[in-house]
Amino acid sequence: MGLPWYRVHTVVLNDPGRLLSVHIMHTALVSGWAGSMALYELAVFDPSDPVLDPMWRQGMFVIPFMTRLGITNSWGGWSITGGTVTNPGIWSYEGVAGAHIVFSGLCFLAAIWHWVYWDLEIFCDERTGKPSLDLPKIFGIHLFLSGVACFGFGAFHVTGLYGPGIWVSDPYGLTGKVQPVNPSWGAEGFDPFVPGGIASHHIAAGTLGILAGLFHLSVRPPQRLYKALRMGNIETVLSSSIAAVFFAAFVVAGTMWYGSATTPIELFGPTRYQWDQGYFQQEIYRRVNAGLAENLSLSESWSKIPDKLAFYDYIGNNPAKGGLFRAGSMDNGDGIAVGWLGHPVFRDKEGHELFVRRMPTFFETFPVVLVDGDGIVRADVPFRRAESKYSVEQVGVTVEFYGGELDGVSYNDPATVKKYARRAQLGEIFELDRATLKSDGVFRSSPRGWFTFGHASFALLFFFGHIWHGARTLFRDVFAGIDPDLDAQVEFGAFQKLGDPTTRRQVV
């Protein structure tokens, strides 16, 4: 049977045994990829600096997903939080990877078995003896089982009743750890940044799924509805399944890009909106002002800012700065962060404190402009020096560092001042090692950006797939030219025009 590549799946159209087989094989491939990818990432992952070289800077993709579900230790003796462990137990990163690979192998064998033994009694309609599936009943079974899994995850795993809990952090991604979470049953449970909503929503959705599954197992669909929605056609199942998948893909693309309790910034990196809104910058200034209010010096106040918080306030960690088609981790772009140089404070010769205007997300280059506390431009790095009025040299700008490696160091050399003004456009200033990985200096996106782009793209593709297969199953009779409810016996080939007795073919 010479089928074109886009129609090869018709070989399992009326073959329930082999339809099951290919789905088991698909599960084997997915699980095998997950386990293999985890082992690859563990082979290249450097856990030595969770503050300045976290998993998301290194381009880890599956490690963050394991971590958010409660895996923190490795058989290599390290912990994701930076400590060492002596007895990580079976559910370490390697243990989860191994479990996926073993499961993949079992699915592979099961797929082969079902391909060979495809003609099972369970797939035969006892009235006709032909292969058939009771699709509404199968729908009920799957709904019930997925409801049980959903309820179990929310009620046991997330709450810590039987399981580790999930990754929970503060709003600034500084104190994250795995801990049990109590369900949030009030309005706060609908806040996407409240972890308790994860538990309560899984419990509620799981309960609904169990009840809906029992309903579909015990109540048969009305005949009109059965016919209207083509419930006897396997392509209806394909269409509605694709709808469920693309809807889920759009949802998770949103929760990943805009941020939520399910996508902690410690595991996936900050969102672009945190840079756009100056989210971390505001918190840093709040902490510095609080230190000054306690009679600490400017240097002492800035020295109390955690490197982790300062590092979030750097444009190189903005997932929208990396191009969609630039391969590699963030570390392959601007380099591996080694240390925070400190916060630069610029002043002109009149004593005004100056603030460098920060680069917006979608700019590759941006003019260096320094403004005072009232937003008045006091200095800049001019494009045309002949017409300049506010150049660093003319205004006499100096820079002094507070906190970090250069704490207390000041510069009045214009070339050095301009160098740090340019770097201050990009947020807090860090020493970056570009030699180790031969980093090219071009920003890369984080796993947050890749996940969003991938899921949004496939969701769009699957949306069209849903429309395509939905139309095919709803209008099957129109496309085939045969009315599925045609009662009269039609002998194919007897008439020149199908079903028209006046056009009977002449026997030669």
From Swiss-Prot:
Record flagged with keyword Transport: no
Note how many cofactor molecules are bound and how.
Answer: Binds multiple chlorophylls. PSII binds additional chlorophylls, carotenoids and specific lipids.
Q: What are its GO cellular component terms?
A: chloroplast thylakoid membrane; photosystem II
Describe its membrane topology: Multi-pass membrane protein
Q: Which GO terms of type biological process are on file?
A: photosynthetic electron transport in photosystem II
TM helices/strands, residue ranges: 21-36, 101-115, 140-156, 203-218, 237-252, 457-472
Report the domain of life of the source organism.
Eukaryota
- Molecular functions (GO terms): chlorophyll binding; electron transporter, transferring electrons within the cyclic electron transport pathway of photosynthesis activity
Return any one Pfam family short name: PSII
Q: Which UniProt keywords apply?
A: Chlorophyll, Chloroplast, Chromophore, Membrane, Photosynthesis, Photosystem II, Plastid, Thylakoid, Transmembrane, Transmembrane helix
State the compartments where it is located: Plastid, Chloroplast thylakoid membrane
The record ties this protein, via Gene3D superfamilies, to: Photosystem II CP47 reaction center protein
Record InterPro entries: PS_antenna-like, PS_II_antenna-like_sf, PSII_PsbB
State the family it belongs to.
Belongs to the PsbB/PsbC family. PsbB subfamily.
NCBIfam families noted in UniProt? PS_II_CP47
Q: What quaternary arrangement does the UniProt entry report?
A: PSII is composed of 1 copy each of membrane proteins PsbA, PsbB, PsbC, PsbD, PsbE, PsbF, PsbH, PsbI, PsbJ, PsbK, PsbL, PsbM, PsbT, PsbX, PsbY, PsbZ, Psb30/Ycf12, at least 3 peripheral proteins of the oxygen-evolving complex and a large number of cofactors. It forms dimeric complexes.
Its annotated function is as follows: One of the components of the core complex of photosystem II (PSII). It binds chlorophyll and helps catalyze the primary light-induced photochemical processes of PSII. PSII is a light-driven water:plastoquinone oxidoreductase, using light energy to abstract electrons from H(2)O, generating O(2) and a proton gradient subsequently used for ATP formation.
What is the protein's name according to its record?
A: Photosystem II CP47 reaction center protein
Species lineage: Eukaryota, Viridiplantae, Streptophyta, Embryophyta, Tracheophyta
**Source gene?**
psbB
